[in-house]
Amino acid sequence: MLRTSVRSPLLYRCLSKRFQSTAVPLSSKAVQNDLELTPKQQTNSSTTTSTNIPPQLPVNVEALYYAPLKNPVTHGHLVADLQLRAYDNENLDFFCDFILRAGYYLGLPMTGPKPLPTRRERWTVIRSPFVHAKSKENFERHTHKRLIRVWDSNPEVVQMLVDYITKNSIAGVGLKCTTYQRTTVDAKSGKISDAIEEINSTHNINPSLKENEEIGAKVVELLNTPTFKKYLEEK
């Protein structure tokens, strides 16, 4: 026979109901009467987390996550060539992306960036002029290039783009801009015929000196001087 001494009325009540044949579970009212429970309350911090939705980004800021937009080329008239050079690919590609985005908002039709051949330079020098004079050391430098072309644009707008990217340039990236301008030629005034005659006269100075026109023109100029004519007449 099991002998137990129950001193607490709550424990006695629980044990008595536990060993009953029906085994009815305790109700919530009985538990609340016997035990003082403090239910948890939901704070404001947990409810406000779902309302912290980030605001929608502007279109121009969201466009930074995509490739730069480009205006279509309509007439195919080349206006300018932008050639960029750098020793690092990352800064070069970043600045090309910046130029394309700036040109798009200015309304310039642009193509590129087109990768140009990389220039490789190597040097071999001695490590030291005294102790390590017999050992050599090699140095190598790579110059990366990109080409961006501007089409069908006003020269003033192109100059505005060049000024803007020059003002916001990146250290270590060189920029070379070549512009092309077109002017009207009046055939009635005779400018075309004068230009053709001038070109033909430079070629007909001496047929044997066509490969180097500047040297041939200089030789003819020296032969026509009075000092050379004096010696030629004596002979």
Swiss-Prot record:
Transit peptide limits: 1-19
Main location (coarse class): mitochondrion
GO biological process: translation
Record-linked Pfam families: Ribosomal_S10
Top-level taxon of origin: Eukaryota
Compartmental location: Mitochondrion
Gene3D superfamilies the record matches: Ribosomal protein S10 domain (3.30.70.600)
Keywords: Mitochondrion, Ribonucleoprotein, Ribosomal protein, Transit peptide
Keyword Ribonucleoprotein recorded: yes
Molecular function in Gene Ontology: structural constituent of ribosome
GO CC term, one of those recorded: mitochondrion
Keyword Metal-binding set for record: no
Family per record: Belongs to the universal ribosomal protein uS10 family.
Protein function: Involved in mitochondrial genome encoded proteins translation. Involved in the binding of tRNA to the ribosomes.
Assembly and interaction partners: Part of the mitochondrial small ribosomal subunit.
NCBIfam families in the record: rpsJ_bact
Name assigned to this protein: Small ribosomal subunit protein uS10m
Organism: Candida glabrata (strain ATCC 2001 / BCRC 20586 / JCM 3761 / NBRC 0622 / NRRL Y-65 / CBS 138) (Yeast)
Gene: RSM10
